[in-house]
Amino acid sequence: DYGAVAIINIFISIADIFLSSGLNTSLIQKKDADDLDFSTIFYLNFGLSVVLYLIMFITAPLIAHAYNLPILKSAIRVFAVRLPVSAFQVVQVAYISKKMQFKKFFFATIGGTLLSAVIGITMALKGFGVWALIGQYLTNTVVDTMILWATVKWIPKKMFSFKAATPLIKYSWKVMMTDLLGTLCNNLGSFIIGTKYNSANLAYYTKGKQLPLLFRDNIYTTLISVLFPGISVVNDDITAVKTITRKSMRIMSYIVFPISLGLMAAGKTIVEILFTAKWLPMLPYVYIMCVETIISVPATIALQPIKAVGRSDLMLKTEIIKKISFVILTVVAMNFGIFAIALTIPVNTLLDLIVNAIINKKIINYNLVEELSDCFTALVLSFIMAIVVAFIGETELTICIKAAIQIVSGVLCYTGISWMTKNKEFSYILNVAMKCLKKCNEFN
């Protein structure tokens, strides 16, 4: 069942790029975007989502035949409904990002995640199999969309302009193609494994990727949704852009690094608790993706100023070069097995890091050495914490007690060293948390 969902997700994630990547990004990047711009992009997005759904509907039997999984025919057709539903929220997300109304985005995400988790677990316990996972994904999308429409004070107007659309499309198609190339290459390994091996191999590979990405993507979605609009506001002041980028680099690494290294140190314990011992073959892929996640922090942050200053042309040109190299690397790795295919992911991200740093050096005078130095402190603190967590993992305790001690000791070790060394990122995050608690108390 999970192998089937993994295959479905590949095709839907590719289709999602057309909706969530380019057009709404152009609204955030444009300083004086008005109602005409937002309404125009809304209708374009919805029209595109209908076309994409029809393509998925028509090609579903072909995909099912290619992977020899008959259930894919109906599953893809139902799962693809999230495309037109998503089209109703992407412009809303762009609007609240533009207005810096991030609380609304947070509550929409939390609401969808919690309710979809309940529905997914309930359906799984009732024996719905693959449909439980599809139900979870669809519920998440529908609830997110409903909450955004209920809370965001913008609705599309009865207006559309090809003149307004032209400059937005001119910028966004390059961003869209860049993200599409990235998504295709990120899923290239899954395509190959699903075709050359079997759905069980694909399930271990996909599940191993999913666990680290679950933490990373949620953090990235939150912080990047703040960072990109923030840089776009000051995109004509290079000094301000560099200052914001460096601060974001330090904060992101401070948050992501301990989670990634902690997951590596406690991986076996966590996998056994969450998925049972039969899923332990996914561990090598968990470790590989944790390494990739660490490398992705400077690579991802360094990409934001390139987008914000409007250089989507540079993004696309360099992405083509990077992905050609990645495809060649993956084709070679095919001859050495699934593990070799998985290793191409962190190697590709490392290439992204180097290329993005070269571009940033030219655009905002932020070089690779500065990027790595901004991440170094968090890496050292996280490494010390991971050693402590790994040591506890070798003790002869019951699995649940061991996991609890590993998590608590990891948090205490990381925050304790941060406090003793007067880490600036720790102080900043603590101050933000205290302000949030104060506002909550005032509200109550």
Go through each PLM region and give its residues.
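Helix-terminus/linker motif at the lipid-water interface of multi-pass membrane proteins
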Residues: 1, 64-66, 122-124, 183-214, ...
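Helix-loop junctions and terminal segments of transmembrane helices
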Residues: 17-35, 97-98, 208, 212-256, ...
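Interhelical loop/hinge segments that connect adjacent transmembrane helices in multipass membrane
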Residues: 103, 146-191, 226-243, 360-376, ...
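Membrane-proximal transmembrane or re-entrant/amphipathic helices at the cytosolic face
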Residues: 358-361, 366-368, 375, 387-444
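Helix-loop interface residues and adjacent transmembrane-helix termini in multi-pass membrane transporters
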Residues: 35, 66-69, 99, 127, ...
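Interfacial/gating helices of multi-pass transporter permease domains
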Residues: 1-15, 73-74, 167-171, 175, ...
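Short runs within selected transmembrane alpha-helices of multi-pass transporters and secretion channels
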Residues: 8-28, 78-97, 108-120, 132-149, ...
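Alpha-helical transmembrane segments of multi-pass membrane transport and lipid-handling proteins
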Residues: 19, 43-68, 74-77, 118-122, ...
